[in-house]
């Protein structure tokens, strides 16, 4: 019995030690460093309104349906963050074709003056997460005519807004130019007031 107890004692001590180190000490150190070095990212890259209320995150897309605003990518999960993911249909899957055709039909209703051949792919396909907050500058530009017509904001002003909100590739190498739809719409909202 004493031999069994001598084997169990170090196992229990090591388990408890690693439980405290990995479950308490390490997360606290990492959180502390993140809060000190990159507080905005550590807090979720939140976006606040003029009243200092959280209205979203620059990392998670939102569903904009009002025709006065720029619209983001299609989301198969309706932008519900707790259900992140998409259907990830294969290109040969007929359901993908139906979903894309439905997106194109909705596009044509909202933007009748823009030929379907000019619709960027990111406006009719969803991202892998279904929560993509960004669209391409071209995807924003093809919406200018609709927004200008409804809001009476000159196209030049809207195009300048897109240009100002366009972010380049990460480190100049990774990814493509992109526009955060929430941030773009917040700037547009200032013009609508």
From Swiss-Prot:
Any coiled-coil regions, as ranges: none
Subcellular location: Cell membrane
Location (main, coarse): membrane
Keyword entries, A-Z: ATP-binding, Cell membrane, Ion transport, Membrane, Nucleotide-binding, Potassium, Potassium transport, Transmembrane, Transmembrane helix, Transport
Membrane topology listed for this record: Single-pass membrane protein
Pfam families named in the record: KdpC
Record field: transmembrane: 14-34
Entry's Gene Ontology molecular function annotations: ATP binding; P-type potassium transmembrane transporter activity
Domain of life assignment: Bacteria
InterPro entries: KdpC (IPR003820)
Cellular component aspect of the GO annotation: plasma membrane
Signal sequence range: none
Recorded family membership: Belongs to the KdpC family.
Function as written in the Swiss-Prot or TrEMBL entry: Part of the high-affinity ATP-driven potassium transport (or Kdp) system, which catalyzes the hydrolysis of ATP coupled with the electrogenic transport of potassium into the cytoplasm. This subunit acts as a catalytic chaperone that increases the ATP-binding affinity of the ATP-hydrolyzing subunit KdpB by the formation of a transient KdpB/KdpC/ATP ternary complex.
Quaternary structure (record): The system is composed of three essential subunits: KdpA, KdpB and KdpC.
Protein name: Potassium-transporting ATPase KdpC subunit
The organism of origin for this protein: Bacillus cereus (strain Q1)
Name of the gene encoding the protein in the UniProt record: kdpC
């Amino acid at each position: 019995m004493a031999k069994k107890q001598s084997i169990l004692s170090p196992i229990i001590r090591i388990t408890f030690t690693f439980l405290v180190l990995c479950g308490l000490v390490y997360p606290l150190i990492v959180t502390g460093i993140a809060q000190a070095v990159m507080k905005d990212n550590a807090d979720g890259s939140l976006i606040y309104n003029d009243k200092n209320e959280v209205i979203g995150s620059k990392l998670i897309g939102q569903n904009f349906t009002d025709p006065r605003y720029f619209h983001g990518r299609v989301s198969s999960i309706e932008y519900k963050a707790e259900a992140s993911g998409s259907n990830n249909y294969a290109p040969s899957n007929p359901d993908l074709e139906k979903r894309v055709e439905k997106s194109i039909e909705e596009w044509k209703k909202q933007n009748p003056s823009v030929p379907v051949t000019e619709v960027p792919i990111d406006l009719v396909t969803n991202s892998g997460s279904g929560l993509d907050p960004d669209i391409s500058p071209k995807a924003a530009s093809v919406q200018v005519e609709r927004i200008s017509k409804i809001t009476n904001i000159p196209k030049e002003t809207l195009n300048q807004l897109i240009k100002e909100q366009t972010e380049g590739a990460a480190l100049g190498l990774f990814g493509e130019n992109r526009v955060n739809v929430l941030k773009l719409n917040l700037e547009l909202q200032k013009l609508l007031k």
